[in-house]
Curated annotation (Swiss-Prot):
Residues 27-37 form a propeptide. Residues 47-172 form the C-type lectin domain. The keyword Cytoplasm does not apply. Keywords: Acute phase, Antimicrobial, Disulfide bond, Inflammatory response, Lectin, Metal-binding, Secreted, Signal, Zinc. This is Regenerating islet-derived protein 3-beta. The keyword Metal-binding applies. The lineage of its organism: Eukaryota, Metazoa, Chordata, Craniata, Vertebrata. GO terms for molecular function: growth factor binding; hormone activity; identical protein binding; metal ion binding; oligosaccharide binding; peptidoglycan binding; signaling receptor activity. It is linked to Overexpressed during the acute phase of pancreatitis. A motif (EPN) lies at residues 114-116. Constitutively expressed in intestine. GO terms for cellular component: apical part of cell; extracellular space; protein-containing complex; zymogen granule.
Length: 175
């Protein structure tokens, strides 16, 4: 027979085990695991979690951004790392794009008002941790306030361009 002081301790242990059981017990039916592959519309390419589409009909930066926003969570492309930059460069080169520049989602809404080019940002508000300028936009005499991929860099590097120029553009959106 158990000592009478053992009952409260054992009751507490049993209660603790039951509480833990509810936290570690698995679900009866497993949840559907999302597919690693995304489905993109015809004419666009998948990379990571997004679809990318190059549009050859030239637009101003602002009109291109508005056109991209018509797609699900769409904006002009933000280039967040070297791998994405390489993917984009390959995509733009393989389409036979004959323009010197192609719009991306980079712009400076301060129109150079921030020192050392600090006003540049992505149109979709992604954080700008990766930078790949062809030239320093804050020191150029003919500087623009919208970003583009430059043909002379193999479409890997960025160039500040006048926003009113009509250029092809790349949209980034969800599938």
């Amino acid at each position: 027979m158990l000592h009478r002081l053992a009952f409260p301790v054992m009751s507490w242990m049993l209660l603790s085990c039951l509480m833990l059981l509810s936290q570690v017990q698995g679900e009866d039916s497993p949840k559907k695991i999302p597919s690693a592959r995304i489905s993109c519309p015809k004419g666009s390419q998948a990379y990571g979690s997004y679809c990318y589409a190059l549009f050859q009909i030239p637009q101003t930066w602002f009109d291109a951004e508005l056109a991209c926003q018509k797609r699900p969570e769409g904006h002009l492309v933000s280039v967040l790392n070297v791998a994405e930059a390489s993917f984009l460069a390959s995509m733009v080169k393989n389409t036979g794009n004959s323009y010197q520049y192609t719009w991306i989602g980079l712009h400076d809404p301060t129109l150079g008002g921030e020192p050392n080019g600090g006003g540049w940002e992505w149109s979709n508000n992604d954080i700008m941790n990766y930078v790949n300028w062809e030239r320093n936009p804050s020191t150029a005499l003919d500087r623009g306030f919208c970003g583009s991929l430059s043909r002379s860099s193999g479409f890997l590097r960025w160039r500040d361009t006048t926003c009113e120029v009509k250029l092809p553009y790349v949209c980034k959106f969800t599938g």
